[in-house]
Structures are given as structure tokens and as C-alpha cells.
Amino acid sequence: MPEWRTCSFCGYEIEPGKGKMVVEKDGTVLYFCSSKCEKSYRMGRNPRKLKWTKVYQDMKAELKKAQESQ
């Protein structure tokens, strides 16, 4: 059974047979769900600052929970 992967940039799951696997010179394996994620990674963008990434949305939800509990 093929495995679901997680995008190395945005954090969303990648369906088997979709996306792109990139191996860097140092042997690090990166998975990207779209060319948008790959290009953003290559340009050095921070996924925590982009509203469309799951990483940003999860971080925002944690902050909201912390503020509500205070």
C-alpha cells in the first residue's frame, strides 16, 4: 500500500502518485505537493508567514487557544 507523504513546505498531505520528491546534494529528501511549494522553498520563504500553509494555520490556532485560556 503506497504511503501518504507530507509536504515539506506547507504541511499538507500528498496523495500517493502526486507531488514531487526532491533529493538534495546532502541526501535530504523533500516532498512537495505543488510547484508553488517547491518554488517558495527554493526562494527561502518562511511557511509560518504564509497564510495558505497548514503550518501557519496550525500556529494561528495554537495562539488562539492560548489567548482564550488566559
From Swiss-Prot:
PROSITE patterns to which the protein is assigned, alphabetical: RIBOSOMAL_L24E
Gene Ontology terms for molecular function: rRNA binding; structural constituent of ribosome; zinc ion binding
Gene Ontology terms: cellular component: ribonucleoprotein complex; ribosome
Keywords: Metal-binding, Ribonucleoprotein, Ribosomal protein, RNA-binding, rRNA-binding, Zinc, Zinc-finger
Disulfide cross-links: none
Subunit relationships: Part of the 50S ribosomal subunit. Forms a cluster with proteins L3 and L14.
PANTHER family the record matches: 60S RIBOSOMAL PROTEIN L24, RIBOSOMAL PROTEIN L24
Name this polypeptide is given: Large ribosomal subunit protein eL24
Species annotation: Methanocaldococcus jannaschii (strain ATCC 43067 / DSM 2661 / JAL-1 / JCM 10045 / NBRC 100440)
